[in-house]
């Protein structure tokens, strides 16, 4: 994926982006599968942009239970909220689901016009606001998916959203079974049993991460 195709850089040409990244002192870093990128409790000043791979956002309670809050695909941004609030410790952990490359940019430089008066800062700041709005929407979607009292209701709410996004009744989800259970805030074994029942009832078919919603 080209940088100009990413939401954060929308409206900018590749040459403009190269100049902008130099101005922002951006840094590219690579992470192995399972490696922690940002830890809960960290205080950060940088926005992360996934260039390749996949990132998972999670949090742990004091008993060690993990909740999956979402995933971040190539072209998407993470940690922007914490970077924009000075001194705010992170409430989540960010880790690499697979080998992942991340571009980091200092949020202060993004939001403040540099001495070179780069004309691209306004576009970038506007795009960042749009990104934050989309993240708020994603959080609202998770609240919607977990509002049902039944596991079947939570699964169908999430699968319905995925199907709409894919434009097809057949789609891939970014989670394994444990991660999906954590995302929907349900027990993994109970969820897997419910999935089997849904398949027997002719509601869905599934194989690993491929889901098919039946008519």
Task: Map each language-model feature to its residues.
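Cyclic nucleotide-binding regulatory module and flanking cytosolic helices
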Residues: 1-33, 82-86
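Inter-domain helical "communication" segments and dimerization helices
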Residues: 3, 113-125, 130, 134-144
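Short, small/polar residue-rich loop motifs at catalytic or cofactor-binding pockets
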Residues: 23-24, 42-44
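Cyclic-nucleotide recognition modules
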Residues: 24, 68-126
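Glycine- and acidic-residue-biased ligand/ion/polar-headgroup-sensing regions
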Residues: 34, 45-58, 74-75
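Short phosphate-coordinating micro-motif centered on Lys-Gly-acidic
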Residues: 36-42
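A short beta-strand-loop-beta hairpin characteristic of the jelly-roll/cupin
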Residues: 55-67
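Phosphate-/nucleic-acid-contacting segments
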Residues: 151-154, 158-215
């Amino acid at each position: 994926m080209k940088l100009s195709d990413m939401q954060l850089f929308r409206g900018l040409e590749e040459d403009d982006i190269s100049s902008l990244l130099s101005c922002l002192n951006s840094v590219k870093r690579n992470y192995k599968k399972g490696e922690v990128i940002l830890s809960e409790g960290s205080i950060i000043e940088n926005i992360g942009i996934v260039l390749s791979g996949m990132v998972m956002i999670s949090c742990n309670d004091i008993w060690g239970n993990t909740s999956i809050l979402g995933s971040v695909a190539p072209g998407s941004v993470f940690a922007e909220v914490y970077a924009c609030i000075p001194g705010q410790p992170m409430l989540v952990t960010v880790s690499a689901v697979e080998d992942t490359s991340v571009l980091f940019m200092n949020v202060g430089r993004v939001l403040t016009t540099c001495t070179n008066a780069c004309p691209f800062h306004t576009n970038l700041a506007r795009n960042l606001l749009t990104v934050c709005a989309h993240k708020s929407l994603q959080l609202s979607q998770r609240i919607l998916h977990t509002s049902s009292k039944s596991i079947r209701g939570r699964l169908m709410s999430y699968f319905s959203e995925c199907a709409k996004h894919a434009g097809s009744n057949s789609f891939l989800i970014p989670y394994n079974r444990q991660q999906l259970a954590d995302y929907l805030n349900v027990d993994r074994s109970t969820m897997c049993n419910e999935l089997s029942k849904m398949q027997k009832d002719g509601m869905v078919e599934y194989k690993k991460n491929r889901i098919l919603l039946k008519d």
